[in-house]
Design a protein with these regions (language model features):
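RNase H-like, Mg2+-dependent phosphodiesterase core
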Residues: 1-192
Length: 192
């Protein structure tokens, strides 16, 4: 039986806004591209080019867990849910799933292994990281057009100085994760 390996990673877990995304990638052939590395280490324009290359040379799926799911289940469980959805969307069933980190969703009839810093060690996980990041960044750019003051197109919703300053000045939006410490803290200060 041919070994079919899927790499899985999530993005947006530490963001203060919006959904968390996950991708699953199975390469069609053995790819040794040196540019497929952890998405956080690649400049945005290059990441978009590499994402297209990955999509052309792999079987892939992207999924997400909504803001509501993050608030209801917590970010870890929402991330695992997004990963499971991405895996289930793959057109081919892998017999080995490699997941970045130390937690994995429950997947039936398949060997699942977690790999700490997998996005730096395993090409399939790096590829999943790249396509998930490009996809989520597109959403952040779109959302940023309506909420320019928060600069989500630049910070992807993460708690940068500019983003925190904007929250303090303009308040939180319906897209902010209210259970996340910096956002929750702002809400608590407002109430007192």
């Amino acid at each position: 039986m041919k070994k079919i390996v899927a790499g899985v990673d999530e993005v947006g877990r530490g963001s203060l806004i919006g959904p968390v995304y996950a991708a699953a990638v199975i390469f069609k052939k053995n790819i040794k591209d040196k540019e497929i590395i952890d998405s956080k280490k690649i400049k945005k324009t290059k990441r978009e080019i590499i994402s297209k290359y990955i999509k052309k040379n792999s079987i892939w799926a992207i999924s997400s867990a909504s803001l509501k799911e993050i608030e209801n289940f917590n970010i870890l469980n929402a991330s695992l849910l997004a990963m499971k959805r991405a895996i289930e969307k793959l057109k081919i069933k892998p017999n080995l799933i490699l997941i970045d980190g130390n937690k994995s969703p429950k997947i039936k009839n398949c060997l699942v292994k977690t790999v700490i810093k997998g996005d730096q060690k395993i090409k399939e996980i790096s590829a999943a990281s790249i396509i998930a990041k490009v996809s989520r960044d597109k959403l952040m750019n779109k959302m940023s057009k309506k909420f320019k003051k928060y600069k989500w197109d630049l910070n992807a919703g993460y708690g940068t100085k500019d983003h925190i300053k904007a929250i303090k000045k303009y308040g939180i939006t319906k897209f902010h994760r209210k259970t996340f410490k910096p956002v929750h803290k702002m809400l608590s200060l407002k109430k007192s």
